[in-house]
Amino acid sequence: MDFPCLWLGLLLPLVAALDFNYHRQEGMEAFLKTVAQNYSSVTHLHSIGKSVKGRNLWVLVVGRFPKEHRIGIPEFKYVANMHGDETVGRELLLHLIDYLVTSDGKDPEITNLINSTRIHIMPSMNPDGFEAVKKPDCYYSIGRENYNQYDLNRNFPDAFEYNNVSRQPETVAVMKWLKTETFVLSANLHGGALVASYPFDNGVQATGALYSRSLTPDDDVFQYLAHTYASRNPNMKKGDECKNKMNFPNGVTNGYSWYPLQGGMQDYNYIWAQCFEITLELSCCKYPREEKLPSFWNNNKASLIEYIKQVHLGVKGQVFDQNGNPLPNVIVEVQDRKHICPYRTNKYGEYYLLLLPGSYIINVTVPGHDPHITKVIIPEKSQNFSALKKDILLPFQGQLDSIPVSNPSCPMIPLYRNLPDHSAATKPSLFLFLVSLLHIFFK
């Protein structure tokens, strides 16, 4: 037996170093399958559906319990390459996967992140579009849309106006995926600008459209999330790195303030999937040359990791009856920031609320009963990669048969269309705005 060769083999990494090239569908699939095979204890590879041309929409899950949800462990996701000709995010997510699995057990921060978070990574939502690009271009290429020539970031239901378009297979697959997991936080990776953009992307007068903005009830949290990413990217935070394009102070913008769009994915996530999502524009050039990929990784690595950690902001817990039975489908909302589609507990009675440090009143409402009110104080720093844990015991005897196990969907119609301008579901208060500013400038 050749012992030197044996020892050399043991020292080599389980996955060969991922090169900084663009990986077409076959190469991407081969890499993902190799990772899933060699790191099977912390990864789970699955397809959430197929593109128009039958290509798999792969998702690799990284976590200590990758195959199933565990109570108390929040679900996080990254999605890239929604526009097929915007390619940097696709490669960054492959390198993020490589970094996570090879750092587990070696880097304490990454190990803690994998222990405490279930991370879902979709490198390409539009593989047909990516494969259709024949001549990469900085501004626009055939391949932005899917094979049926639909822009997937205009293809979701819209809460502000009717979006009567043919729902595409890629969009339907993502919508179904969102129903299967309790996603808490997400980001959607794009290219063609350098900015972190937060909801809303569309708007009405009640959300601030008259003032060229459209703000959610959680605007303070969204601004904080966007700044968290942008501030760690040395080029994005400058706000003016892309020539002949709009400048963004501190590398951050409200989506509607930049330009309104109908049927976007980040608004859909926030309103109908109970998931906070922002859009990350990562490169001035949509499809830059391969030799620039290492610098993109270096500029985004810290931001990508730090953003995942934000899934542990705020408070989480379960809602129980007096016999200790978890209560699904119970409305859990923070006073003065009601969502137009109320956030509800999942089938395990779990809730997750992303909140900045401070004092909050939480209303817990079982259908047909008066709200139960509880107060929480979110500390300045999360404890060991965990949000504040606050289980809530409701004064009910026995399981409530009137509560359905699964969450009833809010109708996918323009929910904001006829809402009064003063509604709490549309206007963040002055207090929330001031809190947001304090966290941005004094963090």
Swiss-Prot record:
Activity regulation details: Inhibited by O-phenanthroline and MGTA and activated by cobalt.
Superkingdom field: Eukaryota
Lipidation (GPI-anchor amidated serine): S423
Residues carrying covalently attached carbohydrate according to the record: N38, N115, N164, N363, N384
PROSITE patterns named in the record: CARBOXYPEPT_ZN_1, CARBOXYPEPT_ZN_2, PEPTIDASE_M14
Pfam entry (one): CarboxypepD_reg
GO cellular component terms attached to this protein's record: cell surface; extracellular exosome; extracellular region; extracellular space; plasma membrane; side of membrane
Signal sequence bounds: 1-17
Cofactor note: Binds 1 zinc ion per subunit.
pH dependence: Optimum pH is 7.0.
Site (Probable structural role): E277
GO BP terms: anatomical structure morphogenesis; peptide metabolic process; protein processing
Cofactor(s) in the UniProt record: Zn(2+)
Catalytic activity: Cleavage of C-terminal arginine or lysine residues from polypeptides
Binding site for Zn(2+): H83, E86, H190
Compartment list: Cell membrane
Annotated active site: E281 (proton donor/acceptor)
Gene Ontology molecular functions: carboxypeptidase activity; metallocarboxypeptidase activity; zinc ion binding
Top-level enzyme category: hydrolase
Annotated PANTHER family: CARBOXYPEPTIDASE M (PTHR11532:SF84), PROTEASE M14 CARBOXYPEPTIDASE (PTHR11532)
Family: Belongs to the peptidase M14 family.
Protein name as catalogued: Carboxypeptidase M
Source species of the chain: Homo sapiens (Human)
Taxonomic lineage: Eukaryota, Metazoa, Chordata, Craniata, Vertebrata
Underlying gene: CPM
